[in-house]
Amino acid sequence: MADRNLRDLLAPWVAGLPARELREMTLDSRVAAAGDLFVAVVGHQADGRRYIPQAIAQGVAAIIVEAKDEATDGEIREMHGVPVVYLSQLNERLSALAGRFYHEPSENMRLVAVTGTNGKTTTTQLLAQWSQLLGETSAVMGTVGNGLLGKVIPTENTTGSAVDVQHVLASLVAQGATFGAMEVSSHGLVQHRVAALKFAASVFTNLSRDHLDYHGDMAHYEAAKWMLYSTHHHGQAIVNADDEVGRRWLASLPDAVAVSMEGHINPNCHGRWLKAEAVEYHDRGATIRFASSWGEGEIESRLMGAFNVSNLLLALATLLALGYPLTDLLKTAARLQPVCGRMEVFTAPGKPTVVVDYAHTPDALEKALQAARLHCAGKLWCVFGCGGDRDKGKRPLMGAIAEEFADIVVVTDDNPRTEEPRAIINDILAGMLDAGQVRVMEGRAEAVTNAIMQAKDNDVVLIAGKGHEDYQIVGTQRLDYSDRVTAARLLGVIA
């Protein structure tokens, strides 16, 4: 990384600073070291200003802190020989600051944003896989982790802090990444974590109930997602026209690519479009015949379910909009791999088919069950729970959906966190018409084991809620546990 100094970094906002060299940029006083730039933001959980003395004691070269008001914006002070710069609206400016610090990494790769309630992980993975098959060196950032394909490192949040995002992108560019697919959460948009990124394209998958414990209601949740197109450098816009919100947004995005598998496209009204003409589901996945403003074709997909057809079409439309040839995309489509913990199928002779999925919202659970039904000759089982310390309103909704779409429902723990597990289960049962027919088993490993052992060989067992996760949060403890590993062990296969 080239040399960085305080004067050049803050030149757009503040004059008269020393050209003091900066080693690294951090929001965390615990890792701040000699020569670093410490940014003391007022966060949602902590106030970085409280840790300025600690950062100074650890030898930081400079500090940027939230200004109290416009009058103090750009003010420069000194504490124990360390320059302290005051900036107003620091959280809003942080992405731009970090972008300058890390030499604008989003301008040095082809970066695609994917937002929506469901489908972000699968769509980003498909984009990264497909682009790499076409010669790019591709990376992903999101729920599963960050990194080059095959070298992904797990992360805590879908979208990291504004500094983390720019830092990771810079690291990926340094490793040779030429293409990146990034999940962008509603939290990340509202908290300005991707505000200064230059996206080559931005994809909207769908919108359904989630995160209302944070946003309050669906209107605010939608407004958060819309920020990607209204206030960010979004590049090409690719929008799911099968989603009600997506159809509304298309009216405000005349240059967007409309994507549909349900016929919600009028080629005379949309300049660029892609739609499924016919989809055949089978035990290996699906055969998809499509038409588009770029041409038509047929794809053999190894992914399960209608919503994954939608995810694949969104990825295809994005790559077409970015200029990748349709002929090359069709040649490589059959080599796309299913995504870890996203409708991931485990099979063994004489055993039920087990599907592990991350579905943890009402809409995602319904779609996962509908997808599993397409591949089920016997009974459809559903093993699921709901996370503690999160939106309680979705629990009875998910209970009702499981009861409607599955033949046998097993309600268990998800990540109970600091809530009483039985209280969460009772919230789920409250949404069911006949809760007496539901099997309740609080230990998740026991519930999964019981379901797989009791299911017949022509049954399908959907284990929903945790997907790729290899832990369970009980109280404040993070315990080792994986639905994937549990299912694979019981079937005698490798996860």
Swiss-Prot record:
One GO cellular component this record assigns the protein to is:
cytoplasm
Q: Where, in this chain's numbering, is UDP-N-acetyl-alpha-D-muramoyl-L-alanyl-D-glutamate bound? A: 27, 29, 44-46, 157-159, 185, 191, 193
Q: Where in the cell is it found?
A: Cytoplasm
Quickly give the catalysed reaction. Answer: UDP-N-acetyl-alpha-D-muramoyl-L-alanyl-D-glutamate + meso-2,6-diaminopimelate + ATP = UDP-N-acetyl-alpha-D-muramoyl-L-alanyl-gamma-D-glutamyl-meso-2,6-diaminopimelate + ADP + phosphate + H(+)
Keywords from the UniProt entry: ATP-binding, Cell cycle, Cell division, Cell shape, Cell wall biogenesis/degradation, Cytoplasm, Ligase, Magnesium, Nucleotide-binding, Peptidoglycan synthesis
GO molecular-function annotation terms? ATP binding; magnesium ion binding; UDP-N-acetylmuramoylalanyl-D-glutamate-2,6-diaminopimelate ligase activity
As stated in the Swiss-Prot or TrEMBL entry, residues carrying the post-translational modification N6-carboxylysine are: 225
Q: Family per UniProt?
A: Belongs to the MurCDEF family. MurE subfamily.
Outline what the protein does: Catalyzes the addition of meso-diaminopimelic acid to the nucleotide precursor UDP-N-acetylmuramoyl-L-alanyl-D-glutamate (UMAG) in the biosynthesis of bacterial cell-wall peptidoglycan.
What's the name of the protein?
A: UDP-N-acetylmuramoyl-L-alanyl-D-glutamate--2,6-diaminopimelate ligase
Which species expresses this protein natively?
Salmonella paratyphi A (strain ATCC 9150 / SARB42)
Gene encoding the protein: murE
